[in-house]
């Protein structure tokens, strides 16, 4: 349908449909058909699961997938260019865009796994222990790394959009070789997985992490206010 639900997940359905020239009823029917295509086991409500489980799922399902598939598709492009350098005029530009996105995604996933996801898990652990202090947040607000990740998501989505345009929607010409057809199918699959990956983070994980941090910081702010009041009282001042 071409609706951007990963980086554009906050857009109202009516507005998104209008941009694509679609009716809401047609989109809802397509969503219902899509739901039937998934097994019950895959229909997990990630708005209800723990943030720890969600971050684990993103790493084991989506990060692992990208690390497995990105090198293979890159090698396939190089092989096609070596064997058929003149057959696919846009393939060199596609390869260059793909390699740049691949490099950015590798760094992006590492930052999530080393910095952001442990931060989110630590906040959830602090919530369970019910013993939060200002020392629980030595890296500042979770908003800082989230904003960086969101910008990098936008860049990845833009790269996918450009690659889709360059390949006419990841379509193969009638006379395309089997390797090129496999490449287009692989890019379509990778695009779908990355869109879902970004959706889980932008529209579920990140907003929930921000709300969790806000709830944890409220008692910390109250403690600071109480200490300030006690300090003023000790010196005979008002609050």
PLM regions and their residue ranges:
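Small-residue-biased structural context
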Residues: 1-239
């Amino acid at each position: 349908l071409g609706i951007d639900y990963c980086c554009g997940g906050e857009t109202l359905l009516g507005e998104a449909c209008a941009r694509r020239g679609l009716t809401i009823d047609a989109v809802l029917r397509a969503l219902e058909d899509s739901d039937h295509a998934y097994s019950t086991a895959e229909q997990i409500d990630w708005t209800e699961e723990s943030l720890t489980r969600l971050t684990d799922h993103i790493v084991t399902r989506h990060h692992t997938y990208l690390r497995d598939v990105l090198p293979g598709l890159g090698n396939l492009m190089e092989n096609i260019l070596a064997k058929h350098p003149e057959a696919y005029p846009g393939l060199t530009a596609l390869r260059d865009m793909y390699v740049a996105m691949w490099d950015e995604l590798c760094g992006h996933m590492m930052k999530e796994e080393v910095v952001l996801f442990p931060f989110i898990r630590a906040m959830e652990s602090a919530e369970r222990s019910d013993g939060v202090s200002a020392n629980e947040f030595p890296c500042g607000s979770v908003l800082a790394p989230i904003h960086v990740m969101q910008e990098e998501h936008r860049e990845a989505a833009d790269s996918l959009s450009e690659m889709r345009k360059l390949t006419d929607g990841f379509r193969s010409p009638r006379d395309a070789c089997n390797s090129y057809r496999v490449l287009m199918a692989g890019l379509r699959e990778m695009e779908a997985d990355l869109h879902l990956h970004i959706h889980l983070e932008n529209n579920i994980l990140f907003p929930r992490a921000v709300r969790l941090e806000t709830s944890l910081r409220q008692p910390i702010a109250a403690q600071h206010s109480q200490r300030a009041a006690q300090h003023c009282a000790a010196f005979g001042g008002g609050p």
